[in-house]
Amino acid sequence: MNFKQAYYEEPIIKDIKSSNTFSLSEQVDESILPENLKRKDLELPEVSEYDVVRHYTRLSQMNYTVDVGIYPLGSCTMKYNPKFADRVSAIDGFRNIHPFQPENTVQGALHVMYDLQEYLKKISDMDAVSLQPMAGADGEFTGILIVKKYFEDKGEDRTEIIIPDSAHGTNPASATMGGFDVVEVPSDDKGMVDLEALRAAVSKKTAAFMITNPNTLGIFEQNIEEIAKIIHNAGALLYYDGANLNAIFGITSPGLMGFDIVHFNLHKSFATPHGGGGPGAGPVAVKSFLKDFLPVPIVDFDGNSYRLNYELKKTIGKVSSFYGSFSILLRAWSYIIRNGDDGLKNVSARAVLNSNYLKKKLEKYYDIPYYPLKKHEFVLSTENTGKRALDIGKYILDNGIHSPTVYFPLIVKEAMMIEPTETVSKADLDNYADVLIEALKLSDEELKSRPKNTAVRRIDEVKAARDLKLKW
């Protein structure tokens, strides 16, 4: 596919001014307000609707999204977001309600939230769910606060959270924000948690072990039941990072594996929108002995009506305003209903199939370390090729498709982490493999000159790191 991305010298919206976009035809009587109370400039729109639409359309043409093509960022599950879910979230009966309305006037919305809680409980084999957290990382931090409050309630001084060396970066960040010290354990030669290292790390100070399964190498932690036994025998909790839940729908579940706390990434596994600083949703599920620690409110049903329950005795309190990101909860609810049990199982089966098909096409050209059987994603290394992962990633962009995650996980040198998801076609996968193979035929000099066809070419990464500009 020939590709040349659009480029505009586009100002930010606040710097755009349209001339003569607003006028008043009527004469306004002289104001009786004293001079010191009069506004000198009226806060009237300065940009016409036409100019606003043009502005954001031009920006979209300089962007890349899941609607444009394959977006195989490892551990991000950049699947296509089905548009029927957008239509559901735009129904007037949902869109026009207000969180301050009496409960008896929003029974439909509460019904949806209750159903979603029940669906997530069933999918994860957990006992209670809060929909409060507004993003995956927010859900993860909420889970850590539950861990903290649980041991405070028991009167136990547990100060450490254990994580594997393949963990997501949010895991140590959330643990640290929660006031815990982070202890890292290494992977074994198969890319799984080293059980002996875990046994050595566990102590009376251990509050929890955080892990995702399959892990960030795309490998299923086959010893998860033994891991659960080690952690629980130490009196600690087992925490499931739901980043890779998309690989196991209908096959196994966090509850069956022995986890005590789970956070869901609705923008990953349940196909709600990614990025842009929001919207997001990261519900948290727990086993029954932790239910009273959940953030409030949760939605209850007494057989006749739905209500918001603020009466959990040991709750960590609220972690967001109102009742979570309702429009995103609607989309996830719609996605689950549309797919059903069999459909969700097929989602995972196709995600695993697509990942292994692409891996098989690339393994003759790139090193794919650790245990050979992969799930929904895999990590290859460019080290054996003499090429840099960064340079190959930039070349991929020049072909109108998105690069994988590069340089993560850190335990693989020159890593490229690839998660195609279930929504891409065989033709997409074949083309992606061809581009990765073609990259190896180019000289280092040619690779370093890429991308040439994107709106933004290579940035000065050293300058960007040293001279941060995070606001206008």
UniProtKB/Swiss-Prot annotation:
Coiled coil: none annotated. Keywords: Oxidoreductase, Pyridoxal phosphate. The modification N6-(pyridoxal phosphate)lysine is found at K268. It catalyses: N(6)-[(R)-lipoyl]-L-lysyl-[glycine-cleavage complex H protein] + glycine + H(+) = N(6)-[(R)-S(8)-aminomethyldihydrolipoyl]-L-lysyl-[glycine-cleavage complex H protein] + CO2. It is an enzyme of class 1 (oxidoreductase). Pfam families: Aminotran_5 (PF00266), GcvP2_C (PF21478). Its cofactor is pyridoxal 5'-phosphate. Its EC number is 1.4.4.2. GO terms for cellular component: cytosol; glycine cleavage complex. GO terms for molecular function: glycine binding; glycine dehydrogenase (decarboxylating) activity; pyridoxal phosphate binding. GO terms for biological process: glycine decarboxylation via glycine cleavage system. The keyword Isomerase does not apply. InterPro entries: Aminotrans_V_dom (IPR000192), GcvPB (IPR023012), GDC-P_C (IPR049316), GDC_P (IPR020581), PyrdxlP-dep_Trfase (IPR015424), PyrdxlP-dep_Trfase_major (IPR015421), PyrdxlP-dep_Trfase_small (IPR015422). The glycine cleavage system catalyzes the degradation of glycine. The P protein binds the alpha-amino group of glycine through its pyridoxal phosphate cofactor; CO(2) is released and the remaining methylamine moiety is then transferred to the lipoamide cofactor of the H protein. The glycine cleavage system is composed of four proteins: P, T, L and H. In this organism, the P 'protein' is a heterodimer of two subunits. Belongs to the GcvP family. C-terminal subunit subfamily. This is Probable glycine dehydrogenase (decarboxylating) subunit 2. It comes from Thermoplasma volcanium (strain ATCC 51530 / DSM 4299 / JCM 9571 / NBRC 15438 / GSS1). The lineage of its organism: Archaea, Methanobacteriati, Thermoplasmatota, Thermoplasmata, Thermoplasmatales.
